[in-house]
Amino acid sequence: LFCGPRGVGKTTCARIFAKAINCLNPQNGEACNECESCRSFNEGRSLNVHELDAASNNSVDDIRNLIEQVRIIPQQGSYSVFVIDEVHMLSAAAFNAFLKTLEEPPRHAIFVLATTEKHKIIPTILSRCQIYDFNRIKVEDGVEYLRYIASQEGVTADDEALNLIAHKADGGMRDALSILDQVIAYS
């Protein structure tokens, strides 16, 4: 269970984990980006990673459809990774429908649940999860990454402006990148 404020990288980390765990030639725990599994992931055609946005797909039927997918053995790589974003939005009935699968998953299935509101997840689900807390990104780290992105885009960026963007984003890299993108677009 990845917990933390919006925009700090929970879903991105879940995707990176899903890619790395299925890499056929991992290097120091990192995905190689060259094997067929990594290439299919990078091109958006991996059949081993399944994402469910529980904010809009939160019914028992949505979970039952996911449970049906869990039964399918991966065609490439070792694992099927199921990322359930905004998991706190599942209905109580959907949580209960999911519980047995979470308790006794097939060997090839890994679930990564992401939430901004851990307190809304029923205790029976929480007790079956390893919990990882994500924190807001420090302003100086945000500035450093924004500087990197600006240089990659060939954009000259003033440190004071990057600092202001990082402050306005309040520790959310997604928001910082969105603000930077808007500033670049209107410059």
Question: Across the structure, where does each feature detected by a protein language model lie?
Answer:
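P-loop/Walker A NTP-binding region and its immediately flanking N-terminal helices
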Residues: 1-131
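Extended, largely alpha-helical regulatory/partner-binding modules appended to the mid-to-C-terminal parts
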Residues: 19, 43-47, 62-65, 78, ...
